[in-house]
A protein has these predicted regions:
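C-terminal auxiliary extensions adjacent to catalytic cores
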Residues: 58-128
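Amphipathic alpha-helical interface segments
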Residues: 1-73, 80-83
């Protein structure tokens, strides 16, 4: 959806701005967040597997955090979920590490449809 594109672009710009201001790396500031993470990881010589695990864990943690705040899930249950997902995150990072660019992508059809609907609502807690 439009808001997911905006979110990824804004996160990328903020991340790159932080990199430019705090380290001697003049990374392009007009990058989507996942691309910015990859470029910075390469520049700072972060091993690909560790970079993928950190990125995926951050993504999953953000989703769990929404659940903690709005289900309500509770922090202890959220931590248990994250711990239980660590092997899945590591497995997915290993798959991504050996994948060719044409094999990478994502599909979250129902989530994307919900996002498109959600961005047209008047009263929302979060951007989509």
């Amino acid at each position: 959806s439009k808001e997911r594109w905006i979110e990824s672009s804004n996160l990328g710009k903020a991340f790159c701005k932080n990199i430019r201001e705090n380290w001697d790396y003049k990374i392009d500031t007009n990058l989507a967040y996942p691309i910015a993470i990859g470029k910075a990881g390469s520049y700072f010589k972060v091993p690909l597997e560790k970079l993928l695990i950190a990125f995926l864990q951050s993504f999953v943690s953000n989703l769990i955090n929404v659940g903690i705040k709005h289900i309500p899930l509770g922090q202890s249950e959220g931590q248990k979920i994250l711990i239980n997902l660590l092997p899945v995150i590591e497995k997915q990072a290993n798959i991504n590490k050996i994948s060719q660019i044409n094999n990478l992508g994502s599909s979250a059809f129902l989530s994307d449809l919900s996002s498109m609907y959600h961005e047209t609502l008047n009263n929302r807690i979060y951007q989509t």
